[in-house]
Amino acid sequence: PWLQECSNRVIESGDLVAFDTDMVGPYGYCADISRTFVEGGKFSDEQRRLYSLATEHIQHNKELIKTGTSFREFAEKSWVLPDNCYHNHYPCMIHGIGLCDEWPFIAYPNKDFSNADFSGHFEENMTICVETYIGEVGGKEGVKLEDQYRVTSNGLEQLSSFPLEQLT
């Protein structure tokens, strides 16, 4: 559902189009955001539902991030993907960002947390990306969102400025 190459298919009105834009920015630092748009600007009810789940996922997880919070505690409290979306999840909920995608890499935990290393904690001035892909197994569409932040002593400073779609 994600990480697909382009084809010769013409994008039509009502199609979802997602961009994951890893870019080298000023002084060689990486900028990384993901957005999903609908061609023609009008979301279907199903697209709106998926987009709402994706924004809820990002909002919930970013509110958990505080200086000193362990990656394990974050993973334990993180937003739980719906069962019908779990096997389509993106490889991580959070990754570091600097000159490229970097540590930490916080995966979606399995039930006993044996699938990844959750040692470490959020530190002041870490730059991270909080991301999600919401798409049902067997579904035709999905929503990919990602924002970039700096961890501060007072919470998060959002580094990405491109707004999320306003669903009406």
Positions of PLM-derived features:
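Active-site neighborhoods and metal-handling regions in enzymes and metal-associated proteins
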Residues: P1-T168
